[in-house]
UniProtKB/Swiss-Prot annotation:
GO cellular component: cytoplasm; nucleus
Residue span of motif KEN box: 141-143
Lineage start: Eukaryota, Metazoa, Chordata, Craniata, Vertebrata
Keyword DNA repair: no
Family annotation (InterPro entries): MPI_Phosphatase, Rhodanese-like_dom, Rhodanese-like_dom_sf
Location of Phosphothreonine modifications: T508
One Pfam family here: Rhodanese
Record field: catalytic activity: O-phospho-L-tyrosyl-[protein] + H2O = L-tyrosyl-[protein] + phosphate
GO BP term (any one): positive regulation of G2/MI transition of meiotic cell cycle
Signal peptide region: none
Domain Rhodanese: 377-483
Residue numbers of Phosphoserine PTMs: S76, S79, S82, S88, S124, S178, S283, S296, S514, S520
Region Disordered, residue ranges: 1-42, 260-318
Protein known as: M-phase inducer phosphatase 1
């Protein structure tokens, strides 16, 4: 048989179609080098093994069978049943084999599960002829660029059951993408025809195979997933898109109770605490249908609306020691209007001043206290005059105590603190000439030392005030409460030396104070 020139990219091993030579002794065939000629070691070994007895060689067959089989297939191709295409096609191939939609060439053997390619030669020989004819027709396709097949969403398993049964009958016509061409056992067709088809070895393909499809050679990652058809969208979901927006009720800050407010006034008026905390009622359109919650509500009998309990007040560990009436007063008050120990609100009406962290009172409030207006609520009313002694002697508020040094104030107030009794308060008011520097600084110092000497939030003097405008403004408005009824400024020409002396003393004491604080911090380390 005369063959044309083979293309350079295809490597094939060709043998001359000559009559089979006479058999030689086994020892010479096995070890002789003259037989090998110019063949490669692998080819020599293949020819030698085929000529051995007991391995299905040609010598076991009659002479006429050997002559006819040598024209169709050489012995060297018997070990190539896996599809490596080392032989040329035979002349007896029929045209009907072209219609076979074989899509994989370099693939696994057909009988991989349960058998060996060497033991199934009769069936593989017929397949090799089909493979060789397809190679000759489509040998230029190997030069084309290989592209992986794009994954396609698999259809439902139930929709392809009938199609899978048809495909399983003929494994070569419509083979699955993810399975090789020779992956199934010999009884595959019997199983599929009997109806006991199992998808274990034949995964379902998302799309029916065709002759033009290119097999990717990889396992389809989308196979084996139990995907169901999209269920019909419930009507409650459509209401989320079509229903109007539901606005939550805005919370009014004016009606909301404070941090320490009690629920009694809120519940008596319009139950503001319940309105601020209670969830908004869900509409019937928002609630999904067919849920477990709906099931339980239908099974249980309908009950009358039970009024929701009022909001429990926030409890604080610092308020456990106070009586019930005091705690109620705390809840009624705004947290910003509570005194230092958070036990009650401020007694006096405060005004804005230079320092936002301090509470200021007007000269009129000071005069009303001196007139005894709050005598039933106040046990002790202490006025600390923070001016220098020459200023205090020039005129001061009746009953005021002149303490211009921090150590003097600490010894007067904190060494022997004044204890309130009978529910009455102890109030301390600080002032200087303008109540801009010395008075506010002294007020902060007393609060700081009081905090250090007590467990938070307890204080000896929880209610501290600063007189707005100082002694100068009070003298102009309430001169009758001044003693003597005069006013001496700090920068008086007759007391320049006294001013220098007191300032130096104050600065020295301030420097010593900073040193003492530094020493105390070092001791703590």
């Amino acid at each position: 048989m005369e063959l044309g020139p083979e293309p350079p990219h295809r490597r094939r091993l060709l043998f001359t179609c000559s009559p089979t030579p006479a058999p030689q002794p086994t020892g010479k065939v096995q070890f002789g080098a003259s037989r090998a000629g110019g063949l490669s070691p692998v080819t020599n070994l293949t020819v030698t093994m085929d000529q051995l007895e007991g391995l299905g060689s040609d010598y076991e067959k009659p002479m006429d069978v050997r002559n006819s089989s040598s024209l169709q297939r050489m012995g060297s191709s018997e070990s190539t049943d896996s599809g490596f295409c080392l032989d040329s096609p035979g002349p007896l191939d029929s045209k009907e084999n072209l219609e076979i939609s074989l899509r994989r060439i370099n693939c696994l053997p057909q009988k991989l599960l349960g058998c060996s390619p060497a033991l199934k030669r009769s069936h593989s020989d017929s397949l090799d002829h089909d493979i060789f004819q397809l190679i000759d027709q489509d040998e230029n396709k190997e030069n084309e660029a290989f592209e992986f097949k794009k994954p396609i969403r698999p259809a439902s398993r139930g929709c392809l059951n009938a199609h899978v049964h048809e495909e399983s009958k003929d494994p070569f016509t419509h083979r699955q993408n993810s399975a090789p061409a020779r992956m199934l056992s010999s009884n595959e067709s019997d199983i599929s025809e009997s109806g006991n088809f199992s998808p274990l070895f034949t995964p379902q393909s998302p799309v029916k195979a065709s002759l033009s499809d290119e097999d990717d050679g990889f396992i389809d990652l989308l196979d084996g997933e139990n995907l169901k058809n999209d269920e019909e969208t419930p009507s409650c979901m459509s209401s989320l898109w079509t229903a109007p927006l539901v606005m939550r009720r805005p919370t009014n800050l004016a009606d909301r109770c404070g941090l320490f407010d009690s629920p009694s006034p809120c519940s008596s008026t319009s139950s503001c605490s319940t309105r601020a905390v209670k969830r908004a009622d869900r509409s019937h359109e928002e609630s999904p249908r067919g849920t477990k919650r709906r099931k339980s509500s239908e099974a249980s009998p309908v009950k009358a609306d039970v009024p929701e309990p009022t909001q429990l007040p926030h409890q604080s560990l610092s308020l456990t020691s106070f009586p019930k009436g005091t705690i109620e007063n705390i809840f009624h008050s705004d947290p910003r209007d509570l005194i230092g120990d958070f036990s009650k609100g401020y007694l006096f009406h405060t005004v804005s001043g230079k320092h936002q962290d301090l509470k200021y009172i007007s000269p009129e409030i000071m005069a009303s206290v001196l007139n005894g207006k709050f005598a039933n609520l106040i046990k002790e009313f202490v006025i600390i005059d923070c001016r220098y002694p020459y200023e205090y002697e020039g005129g001061h508020i009746k009953g005021a105590v002149n303490l211009h040094m921090e150590e003097e104030v600490e010894e007067f107030l904190l060494k022997k603190p004044i204890v309130p009794a009978d529910g009455k308060r102890v109030i301390v008011v600080f002032h200087c000439e303008f109540s801009s520097e010395r008075g506010p600084r002294m007020c902060r110092y007393v609060r700081e030392r009081d905090r250090l000497g007590n467990e938070y939030p307890k204080l000896h003097y929880p209610e501290l005030y600063v007189l707005k405008g100082g002694y100068k403004e009070f003298f102009l408005k309430c001169q009758s409460h001044c003693e003597p009824p005069s006013y001496r400024p700090m920068h008086h020409e007759d007391f320049k030396e006294d001013l220098k002396k007191f300032r130096t003393k104050s600065r020295t004491w301030a420097g010593e104070k900073s040193k003492r604080e530094m020493y105390s911090r070092l001791k703590k380390l």
